[in-house]
């Protein structure tokens, strides 16, 4: 039978871990990125990289999710920031709502694997597993998930003509 004192002491020891000190700092970094507009700049950079491909805006969303995950470590912060930025822009570009939401939610989910993932840090501390090894184990699957999403978006863009509108074509009509 567990007594309250043992549970409290175990919880206190768990919170004293040096690895857990990273959690609030990554959350704060994600907050600062969202408030300073850095996420929007990351998005514009990703858009410039992949806008020439069919479905480029969806690809830019996934690319931004991966980059933001690699900086903030929080999949929830990635999904919330990207939903504010990407979904309105996807509506302008005639993406179906179900596809926009799916791309943003899936892109945010990639953040669970891309280091420095807060989930991996907490799991490593709780199970006394090497966090460095967990990070190394998460990189390849996270990038493969992003690649799989790229392929799905490109296939969808080849089947739905409205998704194939190029970024440069849209910019020409805005001016």
Locate each region found by the language model.
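Juxtamembrane and boundary regions of transmembrane helices in multi-pass small-molecule transporters
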Residues: 123, 133-167
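Membrane-embedded alpha-helical segments of transport systems
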Residues: 68, 103-122, 139-148
């Amino acid at each position: 039978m567990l007594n309250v004192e043992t549970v409290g002491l175990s919880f206190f020891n768990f919170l004293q871990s040096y690895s857990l000190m990273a959690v609030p700092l990554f959350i704060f970094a994600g907050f600062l990125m969202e408030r300073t507009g850095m996420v929007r700049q990351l998005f514009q950079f990703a858009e410039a990289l992949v806008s020439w491909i069919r479905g480029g805006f969806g690809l830019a969303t996934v690319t931004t999710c991966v980059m933001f995950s690699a900086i903030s470590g929080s999949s929830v912060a990635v999904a919330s920031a990207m939903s504010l930025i990407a979904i309105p822009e996807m509506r302008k570009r005639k993406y179906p709502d179900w596809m926009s939401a799916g791309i943003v939610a899936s892109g945010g989910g990639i953040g669970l694997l891309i280091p420095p993932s807060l989930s991996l840090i907490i799991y490593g501390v709780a199970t006394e597993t090497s966090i460095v090894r967990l990070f190394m184990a998460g990189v390849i699957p996270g990038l493969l998930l992003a690649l799989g999403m790229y392929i799905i978006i490109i296939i969808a863009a080849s089947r739905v003509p409205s998704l194939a509108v190029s970024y440069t074509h849209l910019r020409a009509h805005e001016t």
